[in-house]
């Protein structure tokens, strides 16, 4: 998700999105560890999404 799209969300929606993205990252890491993940580039992409969400939450003062 792009930063501009994330900035339009409310603080509660961002927190929900953060939890969802962190769970996705956990699942990706688990799949990678068990050799079930084919697209390993999804892990850094999920990390970047977490960082984007955290940055926007800090900008909004949450």
UniProtKB/Swiss-Prot annotation:
- Family the UniProt entry places it in: Belongs to the universal ribosomal protein uL29 family.
The highest taxon in the source lineage is: Bacteria
Pfam families assigned: Ribosomal_L29
Q: Tell me the protein's name.
A: Large ribosomal subunit protein uL29
**What does the entry list under GO cellular component?**
cytosolic large ribosomal subunit
User: What keywords appear on the UniProt entry?
Assistant: Ribonucleoprotein, Ribosomal protein
Name the CDD domains for this protein: Ribosomal_L29_HIP
Q: Name any one GO molecular function.
A: structural constituent of ribosome
In the UniProt record, what gene is named as encoding this protein? rpmC
What are the recorded Gene Ontology BP terms?
translation
Family matches, as InterPro entries: Ribosomal_protein_uL29, Ribosomal_uL29, Ribosomal_uL29_sf
